[in-house]
A protein has these predicted regions:
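Phosphate-backbone binding interfaces of nucleic-acid-interacting proteins
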Residues: 1-100
Length: 100
């Protein structure tokens, strides 16, 4: 299941060269999401904090770098070898809105 969430906070993950920790508001709850953005973006905090994006939320929690990720950021381009971009709604929608 895909839902829109507001990226409220972006933080570095100690001991990881790739991961950032996102705090994401989904309307009914906040989730921690770990994403490998540090190697893709010069300043992930400035680029994505405060923006809405699409997340996969029906995955089992996954432990990475000693922390638990409760969803997965949906991005476009990584599989094709281009710098990934976020899947964003064209205008603001309620946090937690479902895609599809």
């Amino acid at each position: 299941m895909y839902r829109v969430g507001l990226i409220e906070r972006v933080e570095s993950v100690a001991g990881s060269e790739k991961l950032v920790k996102l705090t994401v508001e989904f309307g009914d709850r906040r989730r921690t999401v770990l994403a490998g953005l540090r190697t893709e973006r010069a300043d992930a905090k400035a680029e994505i904090e405060g923006r809405q994006a699409l997340f996969v939320v029906n995955l089992a929690p996954r432990k990475m770098a000693g922390q638990v990720s409760e969803a997965m950021l949906f991005d476009i381009g990584y599989a094709d070898g281009i710098t990934p971009v976020l899947a964003l709604p064209e205008r603001a929608v309620p946090n937690g809105a479902r895609a599809g």
